[in-house]
């Protein structure tokens, strides 16, 4: 039985670092995977282009959140701040832009792809934007049965209890991350904890196991 997977990231690069190996494993198993990225710095930004290339490499559908979509449609707005005379590059504060509209957008994607597995940042991630992404996703996915949190750049407060063996898919992860050496070391460390060679790790927000299912 194939599954529909939704992975949510605050910014380009988050999903690649946090769970690209697992997404590759899902695709290898025949699951459909949608990568939803909530923010970016415009269509011409290198991070945006890398995210698009990563989605192609992982054979996943990439969807931009409302803020990211607006920035990609109107790249000239990247240099215009929200205050009079302020022309610095500025991403809106999470509280400004990731409100009910963002929650509704996430819920629309979730419903549209009929996702039954959701990956998102940890709600206590040190980065405020990632915490906001987690909060918005948890609100949108309040009726979902399987929600897993992946680690951010700092795993100091991240205590995983669920591991995915990505040994067969590590090369695909390394092809899309900015620091392959760090990604390899992290996957090896997590693999040692999981008693496999390479792994990614997650903290379940909620995980209902369908024992009667084929997977």
Where are these predicted regions, by residue range?
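The feature marks non-catalytic terminal segments
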Residues: 58, 75-83, 144-215
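Active-site adenylate/phosphate-handling loop in enzymes that bind or generate adenylated species
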Residues: 105-154
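Flexible, active-site-proximal loop/turn residues at the rims of small-molecule/cofactor binding pockets
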Residues: 21, 42, 124, 153, ...
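Short, glycine/charged-enriched secondary-structure capping and boundary segments
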Residues: 21-23, 48-50, 132-135, 161-164
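A general structural signal for well-ordered alpha-helical segments in protein cores
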Residues: 48-51, 103, 133-134, 170, ...
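Short, surface-exposed loop/turn motifs that are enriched in glycine and acidic residues
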Residues: 95-96, 123-127, 163
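Active-site rim/loop-helix segments in enzyme catalytic domains that contact anionic ligands
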Residues: 1-114, 142, 203, 211
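Short glycine-/acidic-enriched loop or helix-start segments at secondary-structure transitions
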Residues: 17-18, 45, 128-130, 159
């Amino acid at each position: 039985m194939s599954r529909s997977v939704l992975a949510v990231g605050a910014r380009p690069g988050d999903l690649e670092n946090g769970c690209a190996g697992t997404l590759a494993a899902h695709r290898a198993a025949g699951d459909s995977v949608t990568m939803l990225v909530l923010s970016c710095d415009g269509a011409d930004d290198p991070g945006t282009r890398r995210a698009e290339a990563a989605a192609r490499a992982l054979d996943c559908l990439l969807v931009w959140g409302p803020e990211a979509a607006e920035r990609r449609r109107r790249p000239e707005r990247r240099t215009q701040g929200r205050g009079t005379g302020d022309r610095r590059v500025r991403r809106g504060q999470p509280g400004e832009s990731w409100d009910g509209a963002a929650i509704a957008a996430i819920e629309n994607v979730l419903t549209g792809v009929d996702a039954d597995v959701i990956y998102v940042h940890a709600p206590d991630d040190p980065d405020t934007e990632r915490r906001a992404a987690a909060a918005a996703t948890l609100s949108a996915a309040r009726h979902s049965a399987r929600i897993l949190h992946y680690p951010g750049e700092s795993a100091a407060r991240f205590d995983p209890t669920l591991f995915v063996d990505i040994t067969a898919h590590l090369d695909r992860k390394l092809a899309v991350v900015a620091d392959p050496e760090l990604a390899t070391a992290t996957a090896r460390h997590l693999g040692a904890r999981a008693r496999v060679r390479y792994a990614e790790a997650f903290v379940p927000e909620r995980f209902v196991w369908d024992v009667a299912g084929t997977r």
